[in-house]
Amino acid sequence: MLENYRNLVFVGIAASKPDLITCLEQGKEPWNVKRHEMVAEPPVVCSYFARDLWPKQGKKNYFQKVILRRYKKCGCENLQLRKYCKSMDECKVHKECYNGLNQCLTTTQNKIFQCDKYVKVFHKFSNSNRHTIRHTGKKSFKCKECEKSFCMLSHLAQHKRIHSGEKPYKCKECGKAYNETSNLSTHKRIHTGKKPYKCEECGKAFNRLSHLTTHKIIHTGKKPYKCEECGKAFNQSANLTTHKRIHTGEKPYKCEECGRAFSQSSTLTAHKIIHAGEKPYKCEECGKAFSQSSTLTTHKIIHTGEKFYKCEECGKAFSQLSHLTTHKRIHSGEKPYKCEECGKAFKQSSTLTTHKRIHAGEKFYKCEVCSKAFSRFSHLTTHKRIHTGEKPYKCEECGKAFNLSSQLTTHKIIHTGEKPYKCEECGKAFNQSSTLSKHKVIHTGEKPYKYEECGKAFNQSSHLTTHKMIHTGEKPYKCEECGKAFNNSSILNRHKMIHTGEKLYKPESCNNACDNIAKISKYKRNCAGEK
C-alpha cells in the first residue's frame, strides 16, 4: 500500500498524505478489515465498484450486498451497507450507514473515501485514486516511444509490447503468440471452432463480437466512410484507410524474406506462409489444405455449389461478392486501376499489381524443377502441371481435361457456340474477353511489350516471353517420344503430329493433307485453283 501511494505521488496523482500512510511509514501495524464472501443479491450497481472491490466475484454479480465485520465500537452486530445504483452518475449510499461506519472507525482506520460522483467502499487507498481517475479521464502514464497516454499503468505496460514485440501469451495448440490474453482467447476459437456471436438476421456466426458488428452493416447497406479521391464508399473506416493506399501507392508492410511490400498487414501475414510452406487449414471434404482460412471458406463452396451473388445484367451467379463486383465491370467497361508506367488500365487492383512486375522485371516465384520464375504464385502452380501432367478440370461434354479452370470455361463455349465478346471496330466476335483484347491491338497497332535486349516489340506478353527464349536458348517444352525440345508449347503440339501421323490441314476438295504449318496456305491456294 505504501509503495502504491509513493507511485501515485511520483506521477502527481496524490496531493496530500493520509494518516494511514503516516502510520505505515512509522512502522505501525495497520488495521485489517476482512472482506467477506458475497451473500444474496439485493440491488447494488456500479460496474466499477464490482471490479475494484471484489474483482473475481464482481464479474459474476452486478448486484451485491456488502457485509463488513462487527467493530468493537459499533453497537450493532453487523454493519450493512446497501448500495442502490440506477446509473454511473447516480450511486447512492444510505446516509446513516455511511456516517455510522465512519464514527465507528478511527482516523487511520477510515476506509470510506468520497468520490466526486458517488460514495464507495474501497479495500485499498490506491483503488480510491484509480476509481477517481476513471471519472476524470486523466491520463498520467505516457509512452516514451510514441507519446500515447493512458490512465492506468497496466494499460501502458500492455501497450509497450507493441513496440518491444513481446508476445508472452502462447497458444499450446499451434504455438502462435500474442501480446494480450484476450487475443489468445479469441485465437483459440479457430481450433475449437467456437463462434459465440450469431447474426439474428441471417444466422451467420462469428468468433469475435467486432466481426459480428461489422457484418451487421451488410444488412443495413450503410456505407458511411467515403473516399474523397474517387467517391467510393465503405462500411468500415479501416477499409477506407486501406483503399486510400491505392491512390497513394503506400505499402507499409514489407516481407523480410523477399522484400515484397503490401498495403495490408493481413496480406503480408498470408504472404509469409508462402515462404514457410505452411497450410494449416484443411478441407474435411477432400483433404485439400490452404494457407488461409478465407481461401478454405471459398474452396468449400465448390462442394456445396452455393452461389449467392447474382448479376442483374446477365444472370450469372458467383460464390463471392468481390467476384460479382469484378464481373460487373465487364458490362460497364470500367477499369479503375491504371498503370502509371504505360497507361494501361485494369478491372482489378491485383491485375495491376501483377502487370507492374512486367516493367519492374520482378519474378518472386521459382519452379524447383526447371528454375523458371514467375511474377505470380498462381502462375507457378499452373506451370508445375506441365511437369506433373496434372489436368484436374474435365469437360463433362467431351471428356477433354485441362490444367486451368479458365481453359475449361473457354472450352465449354465451343460446345455452345457462344461468342459474347464483340469487336466494335470490325464486328468480329470472340468467346473470350482476353481474345477480344488481343484482337483490338490489330486495329490500334499497339505493341506495349518491348524486349530491352534487342528492342523488338510485341502486342502480347506471351509473344514477348516466347521471344526471350530465342536469346536465352531456353526450351522448356520437351517431346516425350523423341526428346526434342521447343520454346513454345504450340510448336511441341504440332511436332507430336509427326509421331501420331495426324495432319494439320486437309482440304474438302481433295485427299491430300498437310502436316507442315508453313505449307498450309500454299495447299489452300492449290486446292482452290489459284496460281
From Swiss-Prot:
Zinc finger (C2H2-type): 141-163, 169-191, 197-219, 225-247, 253-275, 281-303, 309-331, 337-359, 365-387, 393-415, 421-443, 449-471, 477-499
Ranges for domain KRAB: 1-43
One cellular component (GO) term of this entry: nucleus
UniProtKB keywords: DNA-binding, Metal-binding, Nucleus, Repeat, Transcription, Transcription regulation, Zinc, Zinc-finger
Gene Ontology biological process: regulation of DNA-templated transcription
InterPro entries: KRAB, KRAB_dom_sf, Znf_C2H2-type, Znf_C2H2_sf, Znf_C2H2_type
Predominant location: nucleus
Paired cysteines (S-S): none
GO molecular-function terms, A-Z: DNA-binding transcription factor activity, RNA polymerase II-specific; RNA polymerase II cis-regulatory region sequence-specific DNA binding; zinc ion binding
Iron-sulfur recorded as keyword: no
Subcellular location: Nucleus
Record field: transmembrane: none
Family: Belongs to the krueppel C2H2-type zinc-finger protein family.
Xref: PANTHER family: C2H2-TYPE DOMAIN-CONTAINING PROTEIN, ZNF44 PROTEIN
Stated role: May be involved in transcriptional regulation.
Name of this chain's protein: Zinc finger protein 492
